[in-house]
Curated annotation (Swiss-Prot):
GO terms for molecular function: carbohydrate binding. It comes from the Viruses. Coiled coil: none annotated. It is a single-pass type II membrane protein. Belongs to the asfivirus lectin-like protein family. GO terms for cellular component: host cell endoplasmic reticulum membrane; membrane. It comes from African swine fever virus (isolate Tick/South Africa/Pretoriuskop Pr4/1996) (ASFV). This is Lectin-like protein EP153R. Glycans are attached at residues 82, 86, 98, 104, 110, 124, 130, 137. Its main location: host cell. Keywords: Disulfide bond, Early protein, Glycoprotein, Host endoplasmic reticulum, Host membrane, Host-virus interaction, Late protein, Lectin, Membrane, Modulation of host cell apoptosis by virus, Signal-anchor, Transmembrane, Transmembrane helix. The chain crosses the membrane at residues 31-51. Disulfide bonds join 66-77, 94-153. It is found in: Host endoplasmic reticulum membrane.
Length: 155
């Protein structure tokens, strides 16, 4: 029933329209679908065989991962704690997270300009028995170790 229809299709060498029937049109569609499926299969097989090339990183790549709720910056992970604690308790809390109080360095200064710049944090630096440094607005201030402040852990 459908195989008796004729369609204007391709143009031959003499620039005349060729008339195609249903069988020829269906054959052309099957050939095109076969080519598409074949190229996709070849691509999948190639990617499967050479997957190692896609997974390796160059040694120049600086890729690192931080735990959930930690902030990654310059190959260091920082944790901004929301609980105020004194210097000793803050140090112990960081140890429980397998980290230390953040060191007072340029990376931390740059990071605090972006995150929580108006808060006061303990950093890893003792002045003497009862004092340590705290960080606020990218500047360091001398504080009593017994004063409860927020703190930043790093690892």
């Amino acid at each position: 029933m459908y195989f008796k229809k004729k369609y204007i299709g391709l143009i031959d060498k003499n620039c005349e329209k060729k008339i195609l029937d249903d069988c020829t049109t269906i054959k052309i569609c099957y050939i095109l679908i076969g080519i598409l499926i074949g190229t996709n299969m070849i691509t999948l097989i190639y990617n499967f065989i050479f997957w190692d090339h896609y997974m390796t990183c160059n040694k120049k790549d600086k890729m690192f991962y931080c735990p959930k709720d930690w902030v990654g910056y310059n190959n260091v992970c920082y944790y901004f704690n929301n609980d105020s604690k004194n210097y000793t308790t803050a140090t112990n809390s960081c140890k429980q997270l397998n980290s230390t109080l953040a060191n007072n360095d340029t990376n931390l200064l740059n990071l605090t300009k972006v995150y929580h710049h108006d808060k006061l944090y303990w950093v890893n630096y003792s002045l003497n028995d009862n004092f340590s440094l705290s960080l606020r607005n990218s500047t360091y201030e001398k504080r009593s170790k017994y004063l409860p402040l927020l703190f930043i852990c790093s690892k």
